[in-house]
Structures are given as C-alpha cells and as structure tokens.
UniProtKB/Swiss-Prot annotation:
The gene is dst3. The lineage of its organism: Eukaryota, Amoebozoa, Evosea, Eumycetozoa, Dictyostelia. The active site is at D154. Belongs to the protein kinase superfamily. STE Ser/Thr protein kinase family. STE20 subfamily. This is Serine/threonine-protein kinase dst3. PROSITE patterns: PROTEIN_KINASE_ATP, PROTEIN_KINASE_DOM. GO terms for cellular component: cytoplasm; nucleus. Its EC number is 2.7.11.1. Residues 322-339, 495-522 have a biased composition (Polar residues). It comes from Dictyostelium discoideum.
Length: 562
C-alpha cells in the first residue's frame, strides 16, 4: 500500500463539514502509543456559538503506508464513528483530515474524562448508584452498536467517557469490527484483563464478548482494578478460560442486583449471557436510569483532572530520566509505552496555541504556528522580588501577565513594553485584562504604598510627557538600558486595576500555558500563580465583543509528528 492509496483511503471518508473550520489547541488530555488527544477551541465566534461554546477533541495519529493493519483499523474506527453520530451514548464524530502523514480525527470533547481518569487520577471511588448509571449508559451504547452488527471488543473504564452533563459515552473503536449477520469472529484482540474466554480460545465469538467485558468493567469501577490484575497480562490470558468467572470480592458490600448483574455478564458460556437489549430491563440497570448523580461526580472531578494529568506527565519524565541515567537494564520495568507517550506529550505541548485549519473541500488539514513567537519569561525567584510587566495577548480564553521588567517608556499616558535587551525585536503587545485582583499584584501594590509612605516622592512642578509610571505595576525597575518603543496601547488606572485597551497589532504567540488550577471554561475570570513558569494565568469567558480573527500572514505552516 503506497502513500497515495493511504491518502485515498482516508480522504474518501471525510465528513461534509464547513468548508473551512478553524480551531486552536488548548490542552493535551491524553497520550499513548496510538498518538495524542488534544482539547481545542473554535476561534470563530459563529463556530463557538453553533457548538454551544464547547471544546472539541482532536486525535493525532501518525499513519505509515507500510502499516496496513493499523490503517485499516483506523478506517474502521472512522466508519463506525460516522455511522453512530445519532447515538448519544457514543462519542460524536466531527471529521477526519490529513496533514502529511498525520491523521486528525475530530470528535466531541468529553470534559469529565474517562472513568479510568476519575478512579485513577482523581482517586474517586464510585458508589453503587453511580456505577449503575455508568453501566446503563454503556448498555444503551452497546444496544445501538450491536443492532448495527458492530462489536466494540475493548470495553473498559478507560474507553468510557463522561461529558459535562455526566452522560456516559463509548470511545476508542480502534479494534472494533463489523460482522455479517450470524458471522462469528476469530481474531484474538482486545485488552487481556477484559477479554472474554471465547476470544482467547479462538472458538469464534460475537457481540456477547462485549457483555463479558462489561461485567469485568463493572468490577473494575467498583474495586478500582479489574479482576486478576496482580497477574501479568501475558499469563492472565491463559487463566481466564480455565478458571471460574470472577465476581465481586466482597458481595455483602453490594446489592443483590449488582451481584446478579455481574454474574449474568460473566457467564463462561456466551449463549447463557444476556444480550445488551435484555440487560436494559435488568434491575441493576433500571437503578441507573438517572444521570444527575454522574453530573455531580463530573463537577467534582473536573478541577482535579488538569492537575493530575500534569502530575502524570511529570512522573513519565522522571521515569525517562531514570532510564537515561541508570541504563535500560537497571530500569527494565519501565514500559516502552511510557517513553513513547512522553515523546507524544512533548510534541503536543509544543502545539499549544497553534491554529488548526480543517478544509473539507480539499480534505486536508493545516497546522499553523506564529512566525515570531515571544521568548519565555526570564528566570526569576518565585518570591515577591520578581518584577511584573507587560501583558501579552494569547489566542484562546487566556491572558498571561508575564514577569518581564516593568514598562518604563511612557509618553502621553501610554505604556510601551520594555524589551528584555536592546537586540530584542519581539512585538510585546498589550491587551485588555479587566480588573486584576490576584494576590501577586496586590502584594506588589501594598509594598509600593509602604515605600511611598516612608519616602514620599517629590511633587513635580511641571507635567512631563516622559514621566515613568512603571511603578504602578511593579516594585522594581530594570537595571539594563532599554530602547524607546513606539506607543502600542492606551492605559488608564482604575482603583487597584489596570484597564489596558488592546491594539490592532496583536502578537498571537505560541507559549506554554502552564498548569491551570481551575477549569478552562470558567464563568468568571480567575487568576492562579504558577511558580514553575513564573507567570500569572488569567482564564475565563471572553467579553461578548471580543472576536478572534486569524491573520495568515502572522503564521507559518508546520509539520507535526506526534
């Protein structure tokens, strides 16, 4: 299979979306050997409004012309997603695009993450009513899939997502398949701990294999790990067909309905297992008819997910450092998947702030990065001695107040940002940030007020057009000489806040947005101090009149490899 046939294979499956859809990469939400999933926001106001101001998810997958099996699995995944767009219990498909050898699969973004995220990253232990609601959503999704003769073949907590309203949705159809009526499948595929015994034995199987995986998933959610998790995957596939089916470890901790549900799903004989349609009337599934309890769970989990994902990346980095320093033999227990995932995350991190242009007419994608990105802030202490300075505009619902030296080139009430050195030609543009109430700025203002009380400045006899007002936003001044910059914005001081009006020449920089301590889509502007990147991050809803515009001249197309 050559590259042209690969291109034709995916292009024929492109969805008929808007001729040109533009969104911006906001956050890395998942990564593995398959590639990386990023959360993205629409840049155009009309697109944001038509999509309910919701983020979307973009899955980046590297395609290789020689890897025929992987390409065919991707094709099946796209076909199944396209055919399932009218089922609310399956993640919604938005489109598929090609960028060189990079395949972009665009789907709805489930803000609550996966069940695995919730029980593993957030440390949540679900109560029985929550487990019943999750299983009810999975069963309804399976009813739809099985009616289309589709077998998922990889049901597990990591592939069950929750949207913002707490609705469970099936995802990751990479190993799913569509069979002819009455046809048995023979391919041994899936995740070992969740695989049905008939799959392992090679006896031929049908959609009842998903019912077994559902029973294992129910135990996984209840007990945080699947049965036999202490057995290596290479050995567990030999024990599953030859041992009695698993059950809940402490049956008395759960209702008779839950115990019976697990027992029926985990019948060794697939003919004795109920179908997904039959499970809809099971008392345990009927107990999970309300999704409100899951919405409460999602609301509690969302603030923790960003922090825990960043922590997981740090752990991968530590494992990689340990591998490099100790040698491969000393740390052979570190899986190679972790190394690949870390590489994927690093590559995806570099795409934050980049703009993705999806064109359904040409059936291609373009990934654009700013031609003149701003340099990272200079290294400062995280104490109060750091200097605050110019604010720069970043695409996305964020404004970042970087700790650059304070602005000191002022004329006619205008602040001109100071460069880091005389050779710096970056366009440090300012923007409107509204009322600033961060403890960081308040501390600086209080310290400045104390200094003024001790040493009151002399009252000027005549107004000077070059009067320095940089001390209004910083307690220190730069020691290096600066070059006078042209006026770029108009600033007025209102109480303890700065109202900086944006200019037309906006520098859309690609920067690291750091670790955000609260949800991205907040109803109010909030501030959080990130000691690692030494910056104050503001995020929240943009003003009604604030409309993102994309200027192609400010960007250049890049190749990506995630």
């Amino acid at each position: 299979m050559n590259s042209d046939s690969v291109e034709n294979l995916f292009i024929s499956r492109i969805s008929k979306d808007d001729p040109e859809a533009i969104f911006q990469i906001v956050e890395v939400v998942g990564s593995g050997s398959f590639g990386t999933v990023c959360a993205c926001r629409w840049m155009k106001k009309k697109d944001r409004e038509s999509n309910g101001n919701r983020l979307i998810a973009c899955k980046f997958v590297e395609v290789n012309a020689d890897d025929v099996e992987t390409n065919l699995n991707l094709v099946k995944e796209i076909d199944i997603l396209k055919e399932s767009m009218d089922c609310p219990y399956i993640v919604e498909y938005k489109g598929c695009y090609l960028k060189s050898s990079m395949l972009l699969i665009v789907m709805e973004y489930c803000k609550g993450g996966s069940l695995l995220d919730i029980i593993e990253l957030c440390g949540k232990r679900l109560i029985e009513e929550e487990i019943a609601a999750v299983c009810a959503g999975v069963v309804k999704g399976l009813v739809y899939l099985h009616s289309k003769r589709t077998t998922h073949r990889d049901i597990k907590a990591g592939n069950v997502l929750l949207d913002e309203e707490g609705l469970p949705k099936l995802a990751d159809f990479g190993v799913s398949t569509i069979a002819e009526q009455g046809q048995k499948m023979n391919t041994v595929i899936g995740s070992p701990y969740w695989m049905a015994p008939e799959i392992i034995m090679g006896q031929g199987y049908d959609q009842k294999a998903d019912i077994w995986s559902l029973g294992i998933t129910a135990i996984e959610i209840a007990e945080l790990v699947p049965p036999r998790f202490d057995v290596p995957p290479s050995r567990v596939i030999f024990t599953i067909p030859h041992q009695p089916p698993p059950s809940l470890k402490i049956p008395s901790d759960w209702s008779p309905e839950f115990n019976d549900f697990v027992k029926q799903c985990l019948s060794m004989n697939p003919a004795l297992r109920p179908s997904a349609q039959q499970l809809l009337s099971h008392p345990f599934i009927l107990k999970g008819s309300s999704q409100q309890i899951l919405q409460k769970l999602v609301n509690e989990s969302i603030p923790l997910l960003k922090e825990k994902r960043a922590e997981k990346i740090r752990q991968l980095e530590e494992q990689e450092q340990q591998r490099n320093s100790s040698g491969s033999k000393m740390v052979s227990s570190v899986p190679t998947r972790a190394s690949q995932a870390l590489t994927n995350v690093r590559n995806a991190e570099s795409l934050k702030g980049s703009v993705v242009i999806l064109n359904s007419n040409t059936k291609t994608a373009s990934i654009m990065r700013n031609k003149n990105p701003q340099p990272p802030p200079p290294s400062h202490s995280s104490g109060a001695g750091g200097a605050a300075g110019s604010t720069r505009r970043v695409p996305g619902n964020k404004s970042v107040l970087n700790r650059y030296p304070p602005a000191n080139n002022v004329s006619n009430g205008t602040i001109a940002p100071s460069p880091i050195n005389n050779n710096n030609n970056n366009n440090n543009t300012t923007t409107k940030v509204g009322k600033v109430s961060s403890p960081f700025l308040q501390q600086q203002q209080q310290q400045q007020q104390q200094n003024n009380n001790k040493n009151p400045p002399p009252k000027p006899t005549t107004p000077s057009p070059n009067k320095k007002i940089g001390d209004n936003i910083s307690k220190t001044t730069p020691t290096t000489p600066t070059t006078t910059q042209p006026n770029t914005s108009t600033t007025t001081k209102t109480g303890s806040s700065l109202n900086i009006k944006p200019t037309n020449n906006v520098n859309r920089s690609t920067i690291s947005i750091g670790q955000q301590k609260s949800p991205l889509q907040s109803s109010e502007r909030e501030a959080s101090y990130d000691e690692e990147s030494v910056s104050v991050i503001y995020h929240g809803s943009e003003d009604e009149e604030d409309e993102e515009e994309f200027n192609h001249e400010d960007y250049e197309e890049i190749n990506v490899n995630i």
